């Protein structure tokens, strides 16, 4: 009996020592043995409600914990998540956190890529000579990388140089435009002096209305031609019939222009007869040679007309002369714009 009791005590002590050593390994060999033979480890003893004879009544049983390496634990966790049924949902916190982290990392990589591409494109637009000049040599070749700060500084300086170049070019063009405006002003001064000398006898209180079948735009072209032709030719007055003067245009559709001795004639530089007539006290007409040239030009303009309309033209002094927008051709509008610009200056 005593031998049996001694053997049982020794086995219980050895098992307790083995269990403590296996539960809390202190060496690498014991840890590897536990990891290798963990599937054949003894199961913990079931709890007895009445208590064990070897343990005191007030003591709690020892809780054992298996040792598992970190890599194996992560593998088992992933396998358990993948082996779940489709209806069951995995742990939401860890999965959502990993997806949000992946999306954030992807956005950050995309942002960095766009920034790098933008700086590379900006560097391609800057000439290498400008880079060499602004970096003062520095041993940087065309394929050397420049920092983002240096790239921005070089780009700003390059833009400033381009702006200075544009300003210089605009300054030269402005000088040319000023010269053109000066020449135009001189021409307008000459034309205005000639028109003022030819309209000294005009009356501001009376206006004469003429019926004319020629449209406005050929009439204005005719006036310009007359100004150019009779600019330096003197005007000669010839006495005609005291009752009525009629001048018929060779083209049958050109109509007839007549003036009466009872009306005070008021003409302006825009009138079709002001450059070939001179008025004194009676009714006069220009030199026959000038009148023939004038009628030839009227005939030529009349042949170019496609439509004929009856227009009642009102001839006013040069200071009050205005045309409607619909009566002006593009060339006439340009001339009027130049005249208004000169008057404003």
UniProtKB/Swiss-Prot annotation:
CDD domains in the cross-refs: bHLH_TS_dAS-C_like
Biased composition, class Low complexity, residue ranges: 78-92
One GO cellular component term noted in the UniProt record for this chain: transcription regulator complex
GO MF annotation terms: DNA-binding transcription activator activity, RNA polymerase II-specific; DNA-binding transcription factor activity; DNA-binding transcription factor activity, RNA polymerase II-specific; DNA-binding transcription factor binding; protein heterodimerization activity; RNA polymerase II transcription regulatory region sequence-specific DNA binding; sequence-specific DNA binding
Top-level taxon of the source organism: Eukaryota
InterPro entries: bHLH_dom (IPR011598), HLH_DNA-bd_sf (IPR036638), MASH1/Ascl1a-like (IPR015660)
Disulfide partners: none
Description of how the protein assembles with itself and partners: Efficient DNA binding requires dimerization with another bHLH protein. Interacts with da (via bHLH motif). Interacts with Bap60.
Keyword terms of this UniProt record: Developmental protein, Differentiation, Neurogenesis
Segments crossing the lipid bilayer: none
bHLH domain sequence ranges: 99-162
Gene from which the chain derives: sc
Protein name (Swiss-Prot/TrEMBL): Achaete-scute complex protein T4
The protein's role, per its UniProt record: AS-C proteins are involved in the determination of the neuronal precursors in the peripheral nervous system and the central nervous system. Also involved in sex determination and dosage compensation.
Tissue: L(1)SC, SC and AC strongly label the presumptive stomatogastric nervous system, while ASE is more prominent in the presumptive procephalic lobe. Associates with the somatic nuclei through nuclear cycles 9 and 10. During nuclear cycle 11 distributes uniformly in the embryo.
Region (Disordered): 78-109
